[in-house]
């Protein structure tokens, strides 16, 4: 068998795999349910690695009832928090190193991060909303258990007992609890996490584009030079920040990441060299304020947001709970899929030389 025939055989195997998975691994719609028991949650969703939206859990949260820009500013005041700043709202994403030249080298770019007083973030979001111009995007996305580390003044507004059924189903305690706050410009690029995720939307709407782990062969995960947005302005004051992308040299490294945006048109993805995305199975869902998304471990997801301009917050706000995944048979199957995809890619690259 020639290498080309071998590659075609692999493609055929992937197609058969997806075809057989249609009925039980690939979702075409997402259910909305009321609070389940731990047994129901485990049997119908966790064991099947199946996302679901749960309603009615947050109605008694003080956060859901009272959080507004004014309330949060009054409670947090001059507490310093970590913000991610970018030119385009895309932090931790693959992009051209020269933002004005789409054909320039593609790198994995991290945001410019700095500590500011929370009230400065509120001031910036109000200013950004009024000006409605292409300004810097500020996003609160610090993920190292940020609710407990930087937002502990808000802990009394959250009742984590509403997800006790999830703790029981997962068979573990919460590993990290994170606070998210940002405006419509901020987007999290397509990625996956080794966590079971209970994602609680408090204000606004989170727009998730979900792809099952079985779609891995169609997502072109590759290694890209590590880079960062760097402030080349005269200082870190908001008015003087000027960001440009620079390669990280200390240390120099490559980062494995997915370059594909599943919300782009197929035509654009083909132009970028990603035709296999046509065979993936994306589904876009809206998680509204007061709803909780169960996002299974290893599920690919891209996240955008849409603030409710008539509400008392100009940002979309969410709290999420991470639980360590169980490294069982699903993980073993996924690792096998990764290795076969990697092997096929090596053969393709060999044939190009």
From Swiss-Prot:
Pfam families: Cupin_8 (PF13621). GO terms for cellular component: cytoplasm. SUPFAM superfamilies: Clavaminate synthase-like. One of its GO terms (molecular function) is 2-oxoglutarate-dependent dioxygenase activity. Residues 138-348 form the JmjC domain. SMART domains: JmjC. Disulfide bonds: none annotated. It comes from the Eukaryota. This is JmjC domain-containing protein E. It comes from Dictyostelium discoideum (Social amoeba). The lineage of its organism: Eukaryota, Amoebozoa, Evosea, Eumycetozoa, Dictyostelia. The gene is jcdE.
